[in-house]
Design a protein with these regions (language model features):
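Arg/Lys-rich, positively charged N-terminal/basic patches that mediate binding to nucleic acids
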Residues: 1-34, 119
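Enriched for short, Lys/Arg-rich terminal
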Residues: 4-9, 13, 81-124
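A generic structural signal for short beta-strands and their flanking turns/coil linkers
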Residues: 19, 39, 56-60
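Active-site phosphate/pyrophosphate-handling residues
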Residues: 21, 76, 108
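Compact soluble domain cores
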Residues: 22, 31-51
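Residues that form generic nucleotide/phosphate-binding pockets
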Residues: 26, 42, 113-116
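Amphipathic alpha-helical transducer elements in NTP-driven molecular machines
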Residues: 33-36, 72, 107, 111
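Basic/aromatic recognition patch in beta-strand/loop cores that engages polyanionic ligands
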Residues: 49-93, 98
Length: 124
């Protein structure tokens, strides 16, 4: 499932997943219900499957296929996984034909968002 040299942690119990509003809106625009469910299942059971994105405070990016596009021309899911006790956050989603990577401004914005959410979570 993963290229040589890539290791992912597969959990016996899925991590709780929270879809942030920006992700939810784009998921409804780009993906069908079955594709959305498959993404949640993949990431909930294999939360380290995505590549870490430098400069984002720990966000990860994973490629997913879309109807008629396949994995290479599909979509990219941006998410945050801290640990199995912390809910996994689905942060953003975009089609590969829209852009290749997050801009520096997006990275900064998402890093601040993740920091704010994790700081609030730790206060509980």
């Amino acid at each position: 499932m993963y290229p040589f040299g890539v290791h992912a942690v597969m959990l016996r119990r899925p991590v709780s997943v929270i879809e942030l509003p920006g992700y939810r809106q784009r998921a409804d625009e780009l993906l069908g219900a079955a594709e959305q469910d498959a993404i949640v299942d993949l990431i909930a059971y294999e939360p380290t499957c995505g590549d870490l994105i430098p400069g984002t405070g720990g966000l990860r990016k994973v490629r997913v296929g879309r109807r008629g596009s396949g994995k290479r021309g599909g979509a990219r899911v941006i998410y945050y996984f801290y640990n199995a006790a912390f809910p996994l956050l689905l942060v953003a989603l975009y089609a590969k034909n829209e852009k290749a990577d997050l801009s520096a401004a997006e990275k900064k914005k998402f890093a601040a968002l993740v920091k704010e959410i994790t700081d609030q979570w730790r206060k509980k």
